[in-house]
Amino acid sequence: MSKKLGFIGCGNMGKAMIHGVMASGKAQASDILASAKTESSREKNAAELGIRLTADNKSVAEFADILFLAVKPQYYEEVIAEIKDTVSDDEIIVSIAPGKSLSWFDEMFGRSLKVIRTMPNTPAMVGEGMMGVCANERVSQEELDTVLDLCSGFSKAEVIDEKLMDVVTAVSGSSPAYVFMFIEAMADAAVAGGMPRSQAYTFAAQAVLGSAKMVLETGKHPGELKDMVCSPAGTTIQAVRVLEEKGMRSSVFEAMMKCLDISRKM
């Protein structure tokens, strides 16, 4: 028997998750009920996804075997206050919020429930997400495996210790923004060199995509792969020299440490 999935929130991340579980055949439209605040959002998502939507978060919580809290972190307390008396003890709660610990959910719900904490990222929208996952002691291995299987429809996922979840926020949750800035900067330089902008974005983005695949598929250290591109007295090593002079490594390092610090304080 298929699990009934509830999604409180149907913004970019909620929509990406719903699309992923349906496109991968892990859930049917009849298995899903989602909520959205505005009528226009409900109508739009119903048309795009073919699922049922409601304005009532309680009805989603009552419907679901697995309940995804797909709203922004600042709305979690409000949503939990609304649904806490509706959620059953057997229901699995899946959080996508940074900075909300497993113990925090016990405090907010006023009792210990089955909670799985995740940190997804926006590449889930194209089926290439990366997420960290941890669960409390009430979640069985079978239940965790079920959620991991669902998430595999839109993201790669790894189970980690909860103390590393804030690191996940910095290294994969927020990092698409850093990568987009890098792609944009490369494209700007290409445009300055005379390339049409649309073509510049394609060249820059594909270079990043291909480079990432080389790291994942070759097993080689990124430094070794970098060295393979840098010919003696060539163009690439001069570009690398400028990036080192301008502090590219330290800028990325410090930005991620700031992100990590903010996540820990949330």
Feature roles, as predicted:
Residues 205-266:
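NAD(P)-dependent Rossmann-like dehydrogenase/reductase catalytic/cofactor-binding core
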Residues 39, 49, 57-62, 66-133, ...:
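Rossmann-like NAD(P)(H) cofactor-binding subdomain of soluble oxidoreductases
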Residues 104-114, 130-167, 180-217, 262:
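Internal alpha-helical scaffold of NAD(P)-dependent oxidoreductase catalytic cores
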Residues 32, 42, 60, 196-204, ...:
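Small-residue helix-packing motif on alpha-helices
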